[in-house]
């Protein structure tokens, strides 16, 4: 067992010991679990069937909004209390990101994920009577979670899906299973203490391909939610037999035109592109600056702490962090080496033979007008960002469209020209479009609106919340129940 794995086990043991040492409240004296099955280890089961059965039984116990509100309050409290421990487990298990930023993500989803308050029924009255449209649960939702946000996604999905009256069976990424499973156990403990309802959140102890395939076609699961990259989304689309909500990859460009507040743009891009080592899919992945202000933008970013590397050094970095690079004729396209996804900028630089301060959070490379540069074309999920120089804002927007690859995920612009911002927003047609701020602002971190870790672009739900995880049911009363 390596040092990192030892750290994971140590922190998990500490969290679980604290869980077990806390005395349950009176509400937990009667635990509602599935009868006739393995009741699990605070939501963890050996067999998929037992997990599904337990989740089905739990879901039937949360029909009232008052109960859901109580459960969500318990989840928020437990998530905040364990934000640091969850972050440490995730970082030590995956090696990705930064503990401080993962703490911030965990806090954000606890505080800014909406609950039942975002669900409202609709009534339609007219000469022929009254029709009521209400939000009904799906039942048991299957949620596939990523290694990039293994605890924040569990917390966020748990709040949103329970708000809609559902229970959840999670399928954590195998490389982050301890982090996700620990979060599931801690949240279940909090729910039990608050309400006595067990197994609203469940998972199979050993996630395997076989378990995932069985989950994707399980007859008693009617909704599958996949938060992850292109590969897992593509696989889910091929085999899923139920409705699918999919959050896929992006390659978000940010354009800076000549009217922008350059200092503000530099700070926003630096903060966004370096946050958690750029593993959030909405983070800025390439900068397209109008040439007349490109040097000033670089200078401002370097003054904050970004380190500029040369094209030759960027080539050395690419050889370290990308597979199939340089690409041979007829060979596979370059793609990120998982070993380096989400690693610190200083570690990446030193592996490529480049001396940078240990405090370095972001590497920047000026690729001039090379829109085919590998760092512009490939989404690395690393704190390495290319800067391209466009002749004018129209060319910058044109390049942004090319580099975003039609994924319709996220894009941004720094400008004080309303026409330019309007033009780019319309052209990009992305689920998230950010003006004059870091891209994370669109997820409630420094901007208005709610937070999610499941940005569903491929299937169209966008920034998900409880409304995304309900079925609309209609009840029609003919000729009666109108008061006018």
Swiss-Prot record:
<comment type="pathway">
    <text>Organosulfur degradation; alkanesulfonate degradation.</text>
</comment>
<dbReference type="InterPro" id="IPR015590">
    <property type="entry name" value="Aldehyde_DH_dom"/>
</dbReference>
<dbReference type="InterPro" id="IPR016161">
    <property type="entry name" value="Ald_DH/histidinol_DH"/>
</dbReference>
<comment type="similarity">
    <text>Belongs to the aldehyde dehydrogenase family.</text>
</comment>
<dbReference type="GO" id="GO:0046306">
    <property type="term" value="P:alkanesulfonate catabolic process"/>
</dbReference>
<comment type="function">
    <text>Involved in an anaerobic respiration pathway that converts the sulfonate taurine (2-aminoethanesulfonate) to ammonia, acetate and sulfide. Catalyzes the oxidation of acetaldehyde to acetyl-CoA in the presence of CoASH and NAD(+). Highly prefers NAD(+) over NADP(+).</text>
</comment>
<dbReference type="Pfam" id="PF00171">
    <property type="entry name" value="Aldedh"/>
</dbReference>
<dbReference type="GO" id="GO:0008774">
    <property type="term" value="F:acetaldehyde dehydrogenase (acetylating) activity"/>
</dbReference>
<dbReference type="InterPro" id="IPR016162">
    <property type="entry name" value="Ald_DH_N"/>
</dbReference>
<keyword id="KW-0520">NAD</keyword>
<dbReference type="InterPro" id="IPR012408">
    <property type="entry name" value="Acetald_propionald_DH-rel"/>
</dbReference>
<keyword id="KW-0560">Oxidoreductase</keyword>
<protein>
    <recommendedName>
        <fullName>Acetaldehyde dehydrogenase (acetylating)</fullName>
        <ecNumber>1.2.1.10</ecNumber>
    </recommendedName>
</protein>
<dbReference type="InterPro" id="IPR016163">
    <property type="entry name" value="Ald_DH_C"/>
</dbReference>
């Amino acid at each position: 067992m390596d040092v990192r794995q030892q750290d994971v086990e140590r922190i998990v043991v500490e969290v679980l010991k604290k869980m077990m040492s806390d005395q349950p409240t009176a509400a937990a004296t009667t635990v509602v679990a599935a009868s006739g099955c393995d009741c699990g280890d605070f939501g963890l089961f050996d067999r998929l069937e037992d997990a599904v059965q337990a989740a089905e039984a739990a879901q039937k116990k949360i029909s009232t909004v008052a109960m859901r509100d109580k459960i969500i309050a318990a989840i928020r409290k437990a998530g905040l209390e364990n934000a640091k421990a969850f972050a440490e487990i995730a970082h030590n298990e995956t090696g990705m990101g930064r503990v401080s930023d993962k703490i911030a993500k965990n806090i954000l989803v606890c505080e800014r994920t909406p609950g039942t308050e975002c669900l409202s029924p609709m009534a339609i009255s007219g000469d022929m009577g009254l029709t009521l449209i209400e939000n009904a649960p799906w039942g048991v939702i299957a949620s596939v979670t990523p290694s990039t946000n293994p605890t924040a996604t569990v917390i966020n999905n748990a709040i949103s899906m329970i708000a809609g009256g559902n229970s959840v069976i999670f399928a954590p990424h195998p490389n982050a299973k301890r982090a996700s499973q620990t979060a599931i156990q801690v949240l279940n403990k909090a729910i039990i203490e608050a309400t006595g309802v067990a197994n609203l959140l469940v998972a199979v102890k050993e996630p395997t391909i076989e378990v995932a395939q069985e989950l994707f076609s399980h007859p008693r699961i009617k909704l599958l939610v996949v938060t992850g990259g292109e590969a897992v989304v593509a696989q889910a689309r091929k085999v899923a037999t139920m409705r699918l909500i999919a959050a896929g990859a992006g390659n978000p460009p940010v354009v800076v035109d000549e009217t922008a507040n350059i200092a503000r743009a530099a700070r926003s891009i630096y903060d966004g592109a370096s946050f958690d080592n750029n593993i959030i899919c909405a983070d800025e992945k390439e900068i397209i600056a109008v040439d007349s202000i490109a040097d000033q933008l670089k200078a401002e970013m370097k003054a904050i702490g970004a380190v500029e590397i040369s094209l030759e050094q960027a080539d050395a970095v690419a050889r370290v962090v990308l597979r199939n690079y340089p690409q041979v004729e007829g060979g596979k396209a370059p793609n990120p080496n998982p070993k380096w996804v989400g690693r610190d900028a200083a570690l990446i630089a030193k592996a490529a033979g480049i001396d940078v301060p240990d405090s370095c959070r972001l590497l920047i490379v000026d690729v001039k007008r090379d829109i085919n540069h590998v760092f512009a074309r490939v989404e690395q999920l690393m704190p390495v960002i290319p800067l391209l120089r466009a002749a004018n804002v129209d060319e910058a927007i044109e390049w942004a469209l090319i580099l975003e690859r039609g994924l319709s995920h996220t894009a941004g612009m720094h400008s004080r020209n309303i026409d330019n911002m309007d033009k780019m927003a319309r052209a990009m047609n992305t689920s998230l479009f950010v003006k004059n701020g870091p891209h994370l602002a669109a997820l409630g971190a420094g901007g208005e609106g709610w937070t999610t870790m499941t940005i569903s672009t491929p299937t169209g739900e966008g920034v998900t919340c409880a409304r995304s995880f309900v079925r609309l049911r209609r009840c029609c009363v003919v000729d009666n129940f109108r008061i006018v």
